[in-house]
C-alpha cells in the first residue's frame, strides 16, 4: 500500500522570528538587508532621521522609528526589543571639507553609531537571552581603501577603529551575550556613493 508523503515544512532560518533594527534602512544596503531579513522570517524595524514613510509595503520594514543623533538614549526601550541591531546610517559630504562638514560627518558616521553600540551592549548585559544579541556595524569600504571624500573616509575609519578596539577588549561572557559583526563592504553604487 502506498504511503502518503509528509507535508513540506518551511525551513527554519537563523533570523526567523527575530526582531532586527536597521539604521539607514531606506538606503541601498538598508533596503537590501530589509528584503533579506524579511525573506528569512524576521520582523524588521527601520530607524530613521526622516519622517517615517506612511503605509507599508511588502519589502520595507514592518514599522519605523524616528530618532536623532545625540538623542540615542531615547531609543533604549526600542533597542531592548531587538535581537539584532544593524548600524548602517551615514552621510557623505562628497568634496565638502568645511568645519561643519567635518563635525556633521563625525557625528553622524562615527559618534552616533558608537553611542548606539554602547547602549545596545549595555542592554545586552542586562537582558540575557537564549540566543545572543547581535550588532552589525557597517564601517564602509573607506576603512580599507581611499574614498573620494576625505571627510567620509576619516569618519568611517574612526568608526571602524572604535569597533575593532571594543571588540578586542571584551571578555568571554560579553562575547557570549552580544556578537559584534563589522561589515566592510566593497564599493557599490548608491545615493551615498554614486561612483
What do the PLM-derived regions correspond to, one by one?
Residues 94-99, 125-174, 189-191:
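Catalytic loop of short-chain dehydrogenase/reductase
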Residues 23, 47, 88-89, 132-142, ...:
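SDR active-site strand-loop-helix element
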Residues 95-109:
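Short alpha-helical oligomerization interface
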Residues 51-73:
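Rossmann-fold cofactor-recognition segment
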Residues 108-130:
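Amphipathic alpha-helical dimer-interface segment in Rossmann-like NAD(P)H-dependent oxidoreductases
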Residues 86-95:
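Conserved NAD(P)H cofactor-binding loop of Rossmann-fold oxidoreductase domains
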Residues 22-39:
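N-terminal Rossmann NAD(P)H-binding glycine-rich loop of SDR-like oxidoreductase domains
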Residues 39-56:
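Conserved glycine-rich Rossmann-like NAD(P)H-binding loop of the short-chain dehydrogenase/reductase
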Amino acid at each position: 500500500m502506498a504511503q502518503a508523503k509528509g507535508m513540506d515544512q518551511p525551513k527554519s532560518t537563523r533570523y526567523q522570528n527575530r526582531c532586527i533594527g536597521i539604521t539607514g534602512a531606506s538606503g541601498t544596503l538598508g533596503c537590501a538587508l530589509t528584503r533579506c531579513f524579511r525573506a528569512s522570517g524576521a520582523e524588521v524595524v527601520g530607524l530613521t532621521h526622516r519622517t517615517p514613510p506612511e503605509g507599508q509595503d511588502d519589502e520595507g520594514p514592518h514599522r519605523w522609528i524616528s530618532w536623532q543623533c545625540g538623542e540615542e538614549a531615547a531609543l533604549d526601550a526600542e533597542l531592548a526589543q531587538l535581537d539584532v541591531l544593524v548600524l548602517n546610517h551615514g552621510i557623505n559630504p562628497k568634496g565638502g571639507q568645511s568645519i561643519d562638514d567635518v563635525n556633521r560627518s563625525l557625528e553622524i558616521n562615527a559618534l552616533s553609531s558608537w553611542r548606539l553600540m554602547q547602549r545596545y551592549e549595555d542592554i545586552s548585559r542586562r537582558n540575557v537571552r537564549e540566543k545572543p544579541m547581535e550588532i552589525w556595524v557597517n564601517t564602509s569600504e573607506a576603512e580599507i581603501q581611499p574614498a573620494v571624500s576625505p571627510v567620509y573616509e576619516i569618519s568611517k575609519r574612526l568608526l571602524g577603529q572604535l569597533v575593532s578596539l571594543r571588540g578586542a577588549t571584551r571578555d568571554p561572557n560579553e562575547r557570549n551575550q552580544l556578537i559584534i559583526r563589522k561589515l566592510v563592504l566593497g564599493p557599490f553604487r548608491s545615493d551615498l556613493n554614486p561612483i
